[in-house]
Amino acid sequence: MEAKTIDRIGDSWLSQQPIYLADLDRCTPADALATEPRLRCWRTLTYEIDSLSGTMLLAGPETAAATITYPLNLRGLHAVSVGVLPITSSEEGHQLAILLKRSGDETFTALTLPPQSDGGPHHHELVEMFWRITDLTGHGLQIGQNGARVAPGDNAGSFECAPARVAYFKLIPLTDAETRAFQSDQQSSDTRRLFAHNDAHGPHYQYRLTTPEHVRREIEPYRDTDFSRMYWEAGGGDQTSYFSRVGGRNTFDLGDFGRRGDRMHVESWREFEQRGIDPFDIALEHTHEIGLQFHASYRVAGFHYPPPLDHFNTGSSFYKRHPEWRGVDRTGRQTPRMAYTFPEVRQFVISLLREMAQRPIDGICLLYNRRMPLVEYESPVVEGFKREFGDDPHGLNAHDPRWLSYRAGVLTEFMREVRAAMDQEGRAQGRNQRIEISAIVGGTERENLINGMDLATWVGEGLVDTLIPYTSGPNYDSGVTAWTDPKQLEHFVNLVRGTSCVLAPNLMPRHMTPEEFRHRAATVYSAGADHMFFWDCAGGSGRANYRDMWNALRRLGHRDEIDAWRASGEPNLSASRMDLRKLGDWDLSYVTPG
């Protein structure tokens, strides 16, 4: 008889009674707790729900509360969840968060608190967030506040923090059988089908990272999940997110930024540079440490940015130095893009990719999903077409198949050059495995050809190892729910069939319900693809946020669990929510608190 599939999402599959720890005023050191709001301290506040009463901890947007420890005396594996008081006002946005780790561990994970349900303006509830299954032998649990210094001194306004509200810990011990099942699941490689993307900008923008531990937080959520690759952005155009000898740094000499977060981003990079710490290397090392591959990703069209967020264009740049290599549109006007029609542009980009490959990365990824096209009506490609076909492409329909096919030869040549360069770097380093090449592309055959990409040739010649269609929506629309019909992937499945090329469709939009993520994954699997990609996993506004969606998302490589869930009637996957009855001395059972 075939064994029944167990759906191991969160802690719902465990059999033991949970242990609730609601007396958070036991945390140490005691002088980091206060009964009234105080800088650098956690405020204690009593509360009641139907099944529990206790003392929660709160910290505000300027508190910069100290790290505290809840002491434990437990052994073995436990599922750890945390009860939180969620977002209650639009001003808090997605910034409400807590930091959590075991005592003795080096790196926190950031849990982004969810919004409260729509229960009216005076409705208050606690929400449970599943963290992970971990061995608590010899460990307590540590809570921190996510924040950044934004001004000198040690006063109100010196720090900007994510408000935090922690009510309880829930621990469920694993039985011997459950421990064996969990460990067997962790050792399995056939479910590790998921690939994550981090733009290496959002975390600096949001939190002004300044230490290696801050960078490692962006990697830590993928530990013990179905993810096998991290696609970490290394640059775009001539700007790099690593210490480069070829490109520029993210340390623009600018006094007025279009967004406050961009100033935080630059200040973060300046501090890392002054300390000689390369965030790229930290991310690479920690990714490998937790067992994932690391693929350096590059925005091929990132040479020049549109206003009003054009502060990225400040100072000397490849774009400004070489107007002769810019794009040209159908009317003969210069466009604000570097054209890959010119070999000099391609070789500059390849020099950056070579530099990235001199680090112990597993692959590079070319991001063709922003600010296309890279080839238009530049003189070399126009004259070449005239010689071959005897026609001027300016007089043809813009989508004439001969013109589109011929023009796509430019990026095919670029991909050949990239393949040759990566193979050469691999041989020079004595690598046993090829430096892999991934490409994020458009969602249809026509869209890709219009943007100069002949994917059939790329796959047929072995120029790309992983193909990532960005979305099934037109014009790279990130807001469209992608891949609602298996037929939308048919073209890509046929392209890679019988080849070594991996197909990993990107699931969009970024945020969906846990049920919707399972539906989209089921569609991808039914279409014949075995892997999935997730653009923008970074930070609290990304996907690795520990909300309900992350519980489902991090196990989407378990196709059997998705199938079993659908066969059982698709039960709700959301976490428990419990109405607060009392908060401090306020009775919340009144229509308005009183």
Question: Where are the regions that the model predicts?
Answer:
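Noncatalytic modules at the cell exterior or secretory-pathway interfaces
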Residues: 132-154
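Extracellular carbohydrate recognition and processing domains
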Residues: 103-138
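Active-site-adjacent "subsite" loops/lids of carbohydrate-active enzymes
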Residues: 186-212, 254-285, 289, 294-358, ...
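Aromatic- and acidic-residue-enriched carbohydrate-binding clefts of CAZyme catalytic domains
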Residues: 238-279, 307-340, 372-409, 559, ...
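Catalytic domains of carbohydrate-active enzymes, especially glycoside hydrolases
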Residues: 213-244, 359-363, 463-469, 524-532
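Active-site neighborhood of glycoside hydrolase catalytic domains
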Residues: 344, 348-500, 512, 516
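A short beta-strand element within beta-rich, extracytoplasmic domains
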Residues: 72-96, 594
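Glycan-recognition and processing domains
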Residues: 1-71, 593
